[in-house]
Each structure stands twice: as structure tokens, then as C-alpha cells.
Design a protein with these regions (language model features):
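Short amphipathic alpha-helices within nucleic acid-binding modules
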Residues: 16-20, 56-68, 119-123, 160-173
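Extracellular/lumenal glycan-associated surfaces
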Residues: 8, 53-56, 111-112, 153, ...
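A short, structured loop/turn motif at beta-sheet edges
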Residues: 96, 114-115, 162
């Protein structure tokens, strides 16, 4: 299993229109392979849309993307400022991208580690993840395979911003999270953003 995250930076004021055009062609596209999630940024880099596509393999991705689909890709090129694509491999404890109502606000956190550190991260997290997911749902966790390397991505769902604050505070206060252990000095950089699901997002 691989998961592709496609992030498009759009011109200011164009996100709503881009989402409408994306939705118009989506029914035909998802006959080829399912959409995992679709968000737009609320806090962090603005005017971005993030669409997530799970595939069984790189070969399955190539086949799906080479299949002709009526009305696809959506007619949003006029809005696009920048496009990036990154492919992740889910951690053993990561949920699958399946339709679910997990919350109205999602936090995407990406951590850059020193080369070779990700295996240790997975081991450390696996010991603490159940206690953390009792507080709020984990939507995804995985490491980068193509694109920027040594990236650890984890996505958490919350009812709203206030719930996020309260849950994260409780996790820290009760010693539930962040996970303890691991090798010090491996984490190099942390970035987060808050995103909101589009009306048609399977994960919402």
C-alpha cells in the first residue's frame, strides 16, 4: 500500500471554485481508484488544496493515472501556482483511508528526521499510539517513499480547534503524548497545518 499526497497552491480566492470543478469530475475518476481525502488549508500555508490517493502499489498508481477519464483532470489549471506530490508508506498501525466522519478539523504534522531514524520512530510510536488514539482519532501515519525523504507524516482528527487544544493539553498533562523513548537528536524539523475537509471528501 502507498498513499499519494498531492498539494496544489492556488491563487488567492480560488479555492472554492477549484473544489467545485474538482467535484464535478470526481465521480468518473473514482471509478478508477478511490479518493482517500480532500482538504483545504485553514491555518498554515494558505490557498492550498490537498488530495490524497491510496493505491495498492506504484504499478497500480501508474495504471490508474494513465487511464483516460472523462472530465479529468479537473479544469483548475488557471488557478494553480504550484504543485507538489509526495508518496508515503503507511505505518503498521496507520488506519486505512476509508470513508469516515472523524471530525471537522484535521491537523497534518510533518516531521523531518535524520536518515535512518524512521524505523525507530515507528517502534516508539507503536508502544504509545493506542493510548493517544483513545483521545482523538488518528487518520494517517506514515513515512515518505518518494519526494522529500526522511519525512514522518501524521494526521489527527478533531471536532474543532477548541477540542484540539483540550485534547493535546490532556495528552501532555497525563504523560500520554508525545511518546517517550527513542534516540535523542534525531528530529530535525517540525511543520503543522490545520485543514478542513471539502464537502465531497470521503474523510470528514
Amino acid at each position: 500500500m502507498i498513499v499519494e499526497f498531492r498539494t496544489y497552491t492556488l491563487q488567492p480566492g480560488s479555492v472554492a471554485q477549484a473544489e467545485e470543478r474538482f467535484a464535478a469530475g470526481l465521480a468518473n475518476r473514482t471509478k478508477v481508484s478511490p479518493l482517500g481525502a480532500f482538504w483545504h488549508t485553514e491555518v498554515g500555508p494558505l490557498n492550498q488544496i490537498i488530495h490524497v490517493w491510496p493505491y495498492d502499489s506504484l504499478e497500480a498508481r501508474t495504471k490508474a493515472r494513465s487511464t483516460h477519464v472523462e472530465g479529468w483532470p479537473p479544469a483548475i489549471r488557471e488557478f494553480i501556482v504550484d504543485q507538489t506530490s509526495q508518496i508515503f508508506v503507511p505505518a503498521p498501525f496507520s488506519p486505512k483511508f476509508e470513508p469516515a466522519a472523524l471530525g471537522g478539523l484535521y491537523e497534518i504534522r510533518t516531521y523531518t528526521y535524520k536518515p535512518g531514524a524512521i524505523a525507530g520512530v515507528i517502534e516508539t510510536w507503536s508502544k504509545a499510539i493506542d493510548a493517544r488514539t483513545n483521545l482523538s482519532p488518528l487518520a494517517f501515519a506514515g513515512s515518505s517513499e518518494l519526494g522529500d525523504l526522511n519525512i514522518w507524516c501524521h494526521i489527527w482528527a478533531y471536532k474543532d480547534a477548541q477540542a484540539r487544544f483540550e485534547i493535546r493539553e490532556k495528552a501532555r498533562r497525563d504523560g500520554i503524548w508525545p511518546p517517550r523513548g527513542g534516540t535523542p537528536g534525531q528530529l530535525l524539523k517540525q511543520v503543522n497545518m490545520l485543514v478542513v475537509p471539502a464537502a465531497f471528501s470521503p474523510l470528514h
